[in-house]
Amino acid sequence: MRPLEGVRVLDLSRVVAGPVAGRILSDLGADVIKVEPPEGDITRIWGEERNGVAGFFLQQNAGKRNISIDLRKPAGVQLVTDLAAKADMVIENFRGGVMDRMGIGWSVLSAVNPKLVMCSISGFGQTGPEAHRQAYASVIQAESGLVHRHATLDGRRPTDPVTSFADYNAGLHGTIALLAALHAARATNVGTHIDLAMLDSMMFTDDYLHHAIDDSEIVRLGGEYWQTADGNWFEIAGQFQFVWAKLKLAFDLVDPTPKDAELEIKIASRRNIVREFIANHPNADAAIAMANKAGLPWGRYNSPEQAIATPTAVHRGIVTQIDDRAGGQRGIVQSPYRFNNYESGVIGRSPHRGEDNAEILADWLNTTPASITQLLTDEVLLTQSQ
């Protein structure tokens, strides 16, 4: 049994932020229906394509069922409205106001389903001076101050991180809000509309933003990277004063600077001593043994390929295998939830566009085969071949 078995989710979102929320809910047992436009989700062409499924689309949409609907047609709008009437949750990530203009906004959907909970994920919110703006993760990472901080601290030109932090933050917070709203709706029989901005989510999860609020100087609290004799790097966590004290105690390191020297001079001297001490270790394994002896927390400087192959990653099943659509298996990152008495995790395959049209309409709406055929003929419903 899975925690969310019996929960129905209509996922109108695309790209990453909304689909992440849908993927999590699916892994937890919900029946998640991805509604895809005729042109397909843009992530269908991002990443390596195997058997008609690209890597980005696979990661965010595996386990969902798929229906392709043309929302430019009145019959398509009606179909989504009918599906929402049977759903517990709706996820969408259009710009503010777009759902209303399409005729499937909150006022319409809540009228046909008063217990519905709907999460609208946008860059800058459903209302406000910039609600109309388009947003991707890179836009929010620039606007939130994240890129500026890293560029300033590292003394380099601004570059976007090679990870969609803003998308995943929004997806995770959207999932939390949806589950809270579902709990309330089941207790009160009253649904709710969640206005979740990627900017809000990004800034809430920024543990350094208090420096800007307090107008105080940023002090980096993370660890430092050190190099061993063979040129490999590894990380020791904690502020340098903590690292120095541990190494000094464990290995009798000596700082030759006078006791009355300026603090900056002492720190520079001790940093050089630690750098030379670690550089005398032949490789990362030797340095890790040293860190363990000193009682210091450490981390390997892994490539992504190394990270997914570590003993812990393998033991935890961080990468699992699903149907590759050609009789084989394909790797995918597993969701991180491990319950002691429930099942969880991705199951099934990543769907082709419109692959489950007939099955979904029969399951949710009891639509007849003849009606489904007519919807296909009228190109209200579409398939990947169209």
Show which residues each predicted segment covers:
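Oxidoreductase and adenylate-handling cofactor-binding alpha/beta cores
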Residues: 171-192, 204, 210-212, 248-254
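Conserved Rossmann-fold dehydrogenase catalytic segment
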Residues: 126, 155-164, 186-199, 216-218, ...
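N-terminal helix-loop segment corresponding to the beta1-alpha1 unit
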Residues: 1-187, 285, 352, 358-386
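Aromatic-enriched alpha-helical interface/lid elements that frame and gate functional surfaces
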Residues: 222-294, 298, 385
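A glycine-rich dinucleotide-binding beta-alpha-beta segment and adjacent secondary-structure elements
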Residues: 294-346
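Flexible, small-/acidic-enriched active-site or ligand-binding loops
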Residues: 215, 327-374
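A short glycine-threonine-serine/GTX helix/turn-capping micro-motif
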Residues: 159-169, 221-223, 234-235, 260-261, ...
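Short, well-structured beta-strand/strand-turn elements
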Residues: 32, 292-306, 367-373
